[in-house]
């Protein structure tokens, strides 16, 4: 018999599935399920998985090797893993650093930790030893689970931790393979309370000390019902989410959301993202739902999409705004619309374009079921343009518990009437939100407010541009002027002629106050989740302007007299 909590969880899920294309009714009727106790892995996953021979997990690598597990195999393996962890002394509330690539053991251990009541702290395999030491110390992590390729980085910094290696035996580490000898049945240490901790994320942002975001057994497992409504997944789907472990989006779309409806999680492991191979894999494996960050979509449209007869039904994107031109190119080739969604590590999906609704290219969408979202100005008043802010009364299930170890920051974020995302947007007459930028990305030039995203959207439509980031460059007369940092498409040379052509095209397209006055062809520094580190670009720009120097492939509008009546000094 299902638990009362599971019954309520499934009733809320089923309402969203029943109205998956009826936005107004879903918004009107959905309520977050009320429950005091709930363990998503025990109360939902195990009953769904028992005797279920459908693929729950399907991993393919670029060499063609495949491995898969049925839902029932995952249920049993995670039970063994939970018993194994308990045997090693892991208890409810203990924090586990899990530093694994996309391999089967990752999912077994994520389920096991939830069943046990331990707290998962997913980490990318790219972290340095200094990063790991910071996480272990500030996060009070007691258990380290790592890939063999990562073990050396824990030397001298994890001596007090339980250390488990997945993949091969390592001196001083317990081999995860030993879990195979433990019992197939698992009995929990009592009930799991909804407010018990479940996941601890270190934000990928651009500061040297990432914030620690704490989620509960309710906020992510239950909160992702809003994400389910946005993604539009259904039982039997094969869902491919282009994401790496350690990023919150991995938990969104490679754990909770697909398995909440019994969809297959599909993984394509490759050393470097290859658009042609990825597209071929989509076709060969019959993927029905694809969610990818903008960087991946921008790479995919460089291929001739019409050559790939995909069987996709749902296309989604999150992480950063997607330029309308990308959406148009995909629509022209496949007849499918990429539907954008918006959320944060601190939340589940709060805004989005769900299936069956009119999509306005480039829009973040509208509030998703369970969320009320408003735009607030600097005085905290409702505005047509302002900070994207979640109404906290009633509090959505998907909002984080706190910033762990930082009571003051938590109070500022969650102690008032709204949770502010630090993202700025505008809203149109039909309730669609439009991204403007991070609160620290938007700048003024000659007293005009500049949204980098608007300029980047124009740049990405130029035939020579693959990717772009617009930042402010210090200017004596205007305070700041827009500068474009550009990655060119393959085969395009980073010459003065290319710079002239792009600047001229932007001059013809943009308003005079938006004019891009500097362009540099360069790499774009990114976080492990693929977000551009604009703070690094800004810091370098400030140094150069103060020193009166320029980059090797940096061009100013003053270099091209035909583009301006008053050339600007080039250094």
Question: Predicted segments — roles?
Answer:
Residues 53-55, 171, 181-202, 208-209, ...:
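Conserved pre-ATP/AMP-binding loop-to-beta segment of ANL
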Residues 63-64, 149-194:
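ANL superfamily adenylate-forming
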Residues 260, 287-292, 301-360, 372, ...:
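Gly/Ser/Thr-rich phosphate-binding loop
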Residues 381-412, 448-450, 544:
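Conserved ATP/PPi-binding loop(s) of AMP-dependent carboxylate-activating enzymes
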Residues 477, 510-532, 551-570:
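AMP-binding/adenylate-forming catalytic domain of the ANL superfamily
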